[in-house]
């Protein structure tokens, strides 16, 4: 049988479909380059139809819309619509038409609220739902609502723990296909998203978007409660949970709850001990790729985040945000117990332990307990003897990068932290905080034995020796001991 080709613009059904679906926008989609191949005689009036339909014109079903006409056509017919830009084949004219629109700059569907335009009606509908926050699909477990049933189904996997998508390389499972695709790039080292500004490549488009803000300096998402700003909408949403105190994600192992699913996932590694991300430079392993990326900057010395006020650079964006508060004097985090304010949430959390006396972090080696996880990590190095941070100036080695930074300031003489009261400058923010207590008269460290209070924890430690009558310092010459 001879094969004929027919240019789609000659088909009445195409013109009818476009005119019927979008009459207001007056869309006349061009089909001259789209070819429809068939094995019978060309001409729309001779299309093979189902029983009872003599011609397209007489067919009653197609008068409603295009889908009706499509039902009339025999499914065995070869209907191939090829996109000109990419070699993609479609078995439905609607799919071909929808796909082609993505390559054009014509966006005929406009949102009346924000004036944003879209090339497809479905995209506009989706956009409107987000704007009006019409959440049709609700989670029965926590009451959280979603715009789409597919999003609800994905969300439900958080509660059920279902992870149907497994990595063939390492066996790790995920609850979403997108997460598996993203994970696979760890093994392939593929980085398809490249920054046009500096050439740096990333394995996620979201990471590139976040990175671009380094160059623009844009922080568009602002918290109404504490005026803190973020470069990502997701980070603002996460931050808001601090104010509400809501913690939806609970660890089945120990019962600890978190306000983010990612934090729960991160926490679970404490129980499993799993560390997938290894540093090629020193062999140290991490449970998060982002932590590995930050760690690598210790070796490279890269500090991409620079303060416009004083020129100081940082390895992490969060460190720059915290640093800026030194210049602005902003202290959004206040202690409900004593009214003291802080420029960082972590500092407030650390401060609260003074009132509670809680020490949840215990060393598995010697049993010593700490009020901060960072303090426990620092302590653990006593047992391992690890000192990865070396000062090039003095040759001194440190187990913490912060200690190395302090050492470097001794050589440079740099003193960034200045007291507004007397003008005295310091090379560490913690020293400035301790110094300020001289002016305020604050003494947060109290002796349980006699009730005497001190402005520094080290002074309290020294004072406690009086009660224990411990003679720590002995003279080698005469043997006399003193406190």
From Swiss-Prot:
Principal location listed in the UniProt entry: nucleus
InterPro entries to which the protein is assigned, alphabetical: Znf_C2H2_sf (IPR036236), Znf_C2H2_type (IPR013087)
Gene: ZNF117
Family, as annotated: Belongs to the krueppel C2H2-type zinc-finger protein family.
Protein name per its UniProtKB record: Zinc finger protein 117
Family annotation (PANTHER family): ZFP14 ZINC FINGER PROTEIN-RELATED, ZINC FINGER AND BTB DOMAIN-CONTAINING
Reported function: May be involved in transcriptional regulation.
A GO biological process held by the record: regulation of DNA-templated transcription
UniProt entry tagged with the keyword 4Fe-4S: no
Residues in C2H2-type zinc fingers: 109-131, 137-159, 165-187, 193-215, 221-243, 249-271, 277-299, 305-327, 333-355, 361-383, 389-411, 417-439, 445-467
GO molecular function, one term: DNA-binding transcription factor activity
Keyword annotations: DNA-binding, Metal-binding, Nucleus, Repeat, Transcription, Transcription regulation, Zinc, Zinc-finger
Example of a GO cellular component annotation carried by this entry: nucleus
């Amino acid at each position: 049988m001879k094969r004929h080709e027919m240019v789609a613009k000659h088909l009445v059904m195409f013109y009818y479909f476009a005119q019927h679906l979008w009459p207001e926008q007056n869309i006349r989609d061009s089909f001259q380059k789209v070819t429809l191949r068939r094995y019978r005689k060309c001409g729309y009036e001779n299309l093979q139809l189902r029983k009872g339909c003599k011609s397209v014109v007489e067919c009653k079903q197609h008068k409603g819309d295009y889908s009706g006409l499509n039902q009339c056509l025999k499914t065995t017919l070869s209907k191939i619509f090829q996109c000109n830009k990419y070699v993609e084949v479609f078995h439905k004219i609607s799919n071909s038409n929808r796909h082609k629109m993505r390559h054009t700059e014509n966006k005929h569907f406009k949102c009346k609220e924000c004036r944003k335009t879209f090339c497809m009606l479905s995209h506009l509908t989706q956009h409107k739902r987000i704007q009006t926050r019409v959440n049709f699909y609700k989670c029965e477990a926590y009451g959280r609502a979603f715009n789409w049933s597919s999003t609800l189904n994905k969300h439900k996997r958080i509660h059920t723990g279902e992870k149907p998508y497994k990595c063939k390389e390492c066996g790790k499972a995920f609850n979403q296909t997108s997460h598996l695709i993203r994970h696979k790039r760890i093994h392939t080292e593929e980085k398809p998203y490249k920054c046009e500004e500096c050439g740096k490549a990333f394995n996620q488009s979201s990471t590139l978007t976040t990175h671009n803000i380094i160059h623009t300096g844009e922080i568009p998402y602002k918290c109404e409660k504490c005026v803190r700003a973020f470069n990502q909408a997701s980070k603002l949403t996460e931050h808001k949970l601090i104010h509400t105190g809501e913690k939806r994600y609970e660890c089945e192992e120990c019962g600890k709850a978190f306000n983010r699913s990612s934090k729960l996932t991160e926490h679970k590694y404490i129980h499993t001990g799993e560390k997938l991300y290894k540093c090629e430079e020193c062999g140290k392993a991490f449970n998060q790729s982002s932590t590995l990326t930050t760690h690598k900057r210790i070796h490279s010395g890269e500090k991409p985040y620079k303060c416009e006020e004083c020129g100081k650079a940082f390895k992490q964006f969060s460190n720059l945000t915290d640093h800026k508060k030194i210049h602005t004097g902003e202290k959004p985090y206040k202690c409900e117990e004593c009214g003291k304010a802080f420029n960082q949430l972590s500092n407030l959390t650390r401060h609260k332990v003074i009132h509670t006396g809680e020490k949840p972090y215990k060393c598995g080696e010697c049993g010593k307990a700490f009020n901060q996880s960072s303090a426990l990590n620092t302590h653990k190095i006593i047992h391992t003897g690890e000192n990865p941070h070396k000062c090039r100036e003095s040759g001194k080695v440190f187990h913490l990068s912060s200690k190395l930074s302090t050492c470097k300031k001794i050589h440079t003489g740099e003193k960034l932290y200045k007291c507004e009261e007397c003008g005295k400058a310091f090379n560490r923010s913690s020293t400035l905080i301790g110094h300020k207590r001289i002016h305020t008269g604050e003494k947060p460290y109290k002796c349980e034995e006699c009730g005497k209070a001190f402005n520094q924890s080290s002074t309290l430690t020294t004072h406690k020796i009086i009660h224990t009558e411990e003679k720590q310092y002995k003279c080698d010459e005469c043997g006399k001991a003193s406190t």
